[in-house]
Curated annotation (Swiss-Prot):
PROSITE patterns: ARGINASE_1 (PS01053), ARGINASE_2 (PS51409). It is found in: Mitochondrion. This is Guanidino acid hydrolase, mitochondrial. The gene is AGMAT. Its EC number is 3.5.3.-, 3.5.3.1, 3.5.3.7, 3.5.3.17. Optimum temperature is 67 degrees Celsius. Its cofactor is Mn(2+). Keywords: Acetylation, Arginine metabolism, Hydrolase, Manganese, Metal-binding, Mitochondrion, Transit peptide. The modification N6-succinyllysine is found at K217. Belongs to the ureohydrolase superfamily. Arginase family. CDD domains: Agmatinase_PAH. Gene3D superfamilies: Ureohydrolase domain.
Length: 352
C-alpha cells in the first residue's frame, strides 16, 4: 500500500506556471484526469508566484495522490535501508530528495523536453515498508508497484537502498515480461549472498536473473569500479550476457557515443533504468553508503539519462542517497535533478 507523506499532504494539481494563486495559504486544486485530454495537467508551482519554502514537501511540490489512477507517471518514495552493508541512512533519502527538488523547473531547456505539458504526473507518497523485516518490505514494495504498473503509470522511485529494485522489477516483469536494464552504479550488485543472506543491496540483480526478470542480452551496467576479492569480479555478469562498462573506460570522455550503442542494443522493447548515486564520484555525491573513488561526473550522468530518450522506458529509480553523509545536501540535489531528467526521457514526453 502507499502512504501519504507527512500531515498537510493534499491531492490535486498545484497552480500552473502561468497562474497566480490567491494570497495567503497555498492550496492545491482538485485532481485532474489524463483521460480529459483538454484538461490542464499537474504543474509544479512557479517560484514567481509561490515561494519555494511554501507548500507540501512533495517531489517538485507536485500534488500528492493516494492512487495511480489517471496518472501517466509518478514519483514514489521507498524509505528502506535494511539491506545496506556499510553506511546506513538511505531510508531518509526520499524525504531529502523531495526537499532539494524545490529548485527544479517545469521544462528542460537543454533537451527541449516538456514533461508537464505531456504527462499527468503526481507524487504518490511512500511505500509503507517494514523496517524490521526485509522480506516483508519486498512483498509490500512488489504489491504497491503491481498496482502502479497495472494502472498504466510509469514509476520514478526515490530510494532507499538498492534492494528495492528487486521487488520493483518483479512487478515490472509481471506486466511486461523480462525487461532490459540500464544499470548505472559503482557495483554490479550481483553477489549471490553475504553472511548467508541472499536478500540485500549487493544482490538484487542476481535475484532478478534467478527469477528470469531480466532480458539479459539487453542489460548494460555503466560506471563499475572498485577493489574486489577476485581478479575477475565480472565473470558472472558477462556469462549472463550483460555488457559491463567499467568506470575507467568512461574517464575523460563523452558518453554520447556509448549511449548510441546502448540505444541500438535496447531496441524498442521495455527497459528499466536503475541509477545508484554511488556511480558518481564521491567528490560530487558523498552522501551514499558505499562510495568508490574515481567515478562518473554529473555531466556524464546527464549524457546517460538523456541518451535514453526514445527508448521504451517503463520505470526508473534513483537509490542509495544517505542524507546523514550529505552535509551540504548536494548529493540529494543531484539526485533530484537526475530524477527530473529521467522524467524528461520518458516515452510520450514532447520535445521542441
Amino acid at each position: 500500500m502507499l502512504r501519504l507523506l507527512a500531515s498537510g499532504c493534499a491531492r490535486g494539481p498545484g497552480p500552473g506556471v502561468g497562474a497566480r494563486p490567491a494570497a495567503g495559504l497555498f492550496h492545491p486544486g482538485r485532481r485532474q484526469s489524463r483521460q480529459a485530454s483538454d484538461a490542464p495537467r499537474n504543474q509544479p508551482p512557479s517560484p514567481e508566484f509561490v515561494a519555494r519554502p511554501v507548500g507540501v514537501c512533495s517531489m517538485m511540490r507536485l500534488p500528492v495522490q493516494t492512487s495511480p489512477e489517471g496518472l501517466d507517471a509518478a514519483f514514489i518514495g521507498v524509505p528502506l535501508d535494511t539491506g545496506t552493508s556499510n553506511r546506513p541512512g538511505a531510508r531518509f533519502g526520499p524525504r531529502r530528495i523531495r526537499e532539494e527538488s524545490v529548485m527544479l523547473g517545469t521544462v528542460n531547456p537543454s533537451t527541449g523536453a516538456l514533461p508537464f505539458q505531456s504527462l499527468m504526473v503526481a507524487d504518490l507518497g511512500d511505500v509503507n515498508v517494514n523496517l524490521y523485516n526485509l522480506q516483508d518490505s519486498c512483498r509490500r514494495i512488489q504489491e504497491a508497484y503491481e498496482k502502479i504498473v497495472a494502472a498504466g503509470c510509469i514509476p520514478l522511485t526515490l530510494g532507499g537502498d538498492h534492494t528495492i529494485t528487486y521487488p520493483i522489477l518483479q512487478a515490472m516483469a509481471k506486466k511486461h515480461g523480462p525487461v532490459g536494464l540500464l544499470h548505472v552504479d559503482a557495483h554490479t550488485d550481483t553477489t549471490d549472498k553475504a553472511l548467508g543472506e541472499k536478500l540485500y543491496h549487493g544482490a538484487p540483480f542476481r535475484r532478478c536473473v534467478d527469477e528470469g526478470l531480466l532480458d539479459c542480452k539487453r542489460v548494460v551496467q555503466i560506471g563499475i569500479r572498485g577493489s574486489s576479492t577476485t581478479l575477475d569480479p565480472y565473470r558472472y555478469n558477462r556469462s549472463q550476457g550483460f555488457r559491463v562498462v567499467l568506470a575507467e573506460d568512461c574517464w575523460m570522455k563523452s558518453l554520447v557515443p556509448l549511449m548510441g550503442e546502448v540505444r541500438q542494443q535496447m531496441g524498442g522493447k521495455p527497459i528499466y533504468i536503475s541509477f545508484d548515486i554511488d556511480a558518481l564520484d564521491p567528490a560530487y555525491a558523498p552522501g551514499t553508503g558505499t562510495p568508490e573513488i574515481a567515478g562518473l561526473t554529473p555531466s556524464q550522468a546527464l549524457e546517460i539519462i538523456r541518451g535514453c530518450q526514445g527508448l521504451n522506458v517503463m520505470g526508473c529509480d534513483l537509490v542509495e542517497v544517505s542524507p546523514p553523509y550529505d552535509l551540504s545536501g548536494n548529493t540529494a540535489l543531484l539526485a533530484a535533478n537526475l530524477l527530473f531528467e529521467m522524467l524528461c526521457a520518458l516515452p510520450k514526453v514532447t520535445t521542441v
